[in-house]
């Protein structure tokens, strides 16, 4: 991103603030993360947002509808308008969740203790899974069926 002058807000900070503002209207959302090309490059195509929903938020179908609605709200809230791709962390593989938490940016945290509990449990699950994942990767790279 270009160098910002005094008093200017960097694009990532502005987008992060707008995302947090929109997400605060949805009590079912327990956390929001930015991830992907928006954080890594100037020539990003869309803005990737991962959401963690409360367990009481509803069935997978309800969560998909809610995520779609939130995506539309985020697109309307951003200026200039950008395409927003929303992923549901609760329904995603552990490896994806870990990648988002590790390389992404937390932009909405209504409950810091809840975020810490989630990320600690996720790290534990990922470390348990990591050995199996590495085994699969070795077999795949070696071309073993």
Question: What is each of the regions a protein language model found here?
Answer:
Residues 48-52:
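Short beta-strand->loop micro-motif that forms the acidic, two-metal-ion catalytic signature
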Residues 43-47:
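A short, glycine/Asx- and small/polar-enriched loop/turn
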Residues 1-31, 39-42, 54-145:
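Catalytic core of pol beta-like nucleotidyltransferases
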């Amino acid at each position: 991103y270009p160098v910002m002058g005094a008093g200017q807000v960097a694009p990532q900070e502005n987008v992060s603030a707008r995302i947090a503002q929109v997400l605060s209207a949805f009590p079912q959302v327990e956390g929001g993360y930015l991830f992907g090309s928006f954080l890594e490059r100037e020539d990003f195509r869309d803005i990737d947002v991962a959401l963690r929903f409360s367990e009481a938020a509803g069935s997978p179908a309800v969560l998909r509808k809610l995520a779609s609605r939130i995506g539309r709200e985020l697109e309307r809230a951003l200026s200039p308008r950008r395409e927003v791709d929303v992923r549901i962390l609760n329904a995603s593989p552990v490896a994806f969740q870990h990648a988002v938490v590790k390389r992404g940016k937390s932009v909405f945290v209504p409950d810091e203790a809840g975020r810490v509990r989630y990320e600690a449990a996720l790290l534990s699950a990922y470390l348990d899974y990591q050995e199996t994942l590495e085994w699969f990767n070795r077999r795949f790279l070696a071309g073993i069926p």
